[in-house]
């Protein structure tokens, strides 16, 4: 099995590049950013307060752990039809809402939550080595934060995508106008948030 790990800052084109590669080679596609968004959606759905400067990290961690260990979560790895489900409900569009976008960092910045997600991501990657997996054992393209440095530092292919800030901001704004649900987020603000919990270059 070939593992391709693609990392980089917000708005650089990780998703479109990753899906194109997976489609070309017949690999599975794993959007780890969507997994973090799904966790934020789940916490909000469970009535957890994610507003304000202080959040209950233990409550968030317990909710996320239940989300994954309680068989509530699933992710589709078909690059043509990637999906996220919670208790059988397709929430692929719901996790791209402005409400989720504005709260996802409150969940993703909780270190124990990241540990849960990293373990889950590694499990999904390992699953593709099986002959009866989506890729029939060929491989997987995984994209998102920590992929090249923490989740799969030993991947056969590791890619760091970069682009100028103004280019990334233009892409984000264009996605918002096109209705992609990313809300035209400020990539500079996202960079600052990411820098607190992830390093693209340190393996």
Please annotate each region the language model reported:
Residues 4-6:
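Hydrophobic anchor at the beta1->P-loop junction of P-loop NTPases
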Residues 9:
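P-loop (Walker A) phosphate-binding loop of NTP-binding proteins
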Residues 14:
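Conserved lysine of the Walker
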Residues 17:
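Hydrophobic positions on the alpha1 helix immediately C-terminal to the Walker A/P-loop
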Residues 20:
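Active-site signature of alpha/beta-hydrolase-fold catalytic machinery across serine-
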Residues 23-96:
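N-terminal phosphate/diphosphate-binding loop that engages ATP/GTP or pyrophosphate donors
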Residues 67, 76-78, 121, 125, ...:
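Small-molecule kinase domains that catalyze NTP-dependent phosphoryl transfer to phosphate-bearing small molecules
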Residues 92-176:
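ATP-dependent NMP and nucleoside kinases share a basic, alpha-helical "lid"
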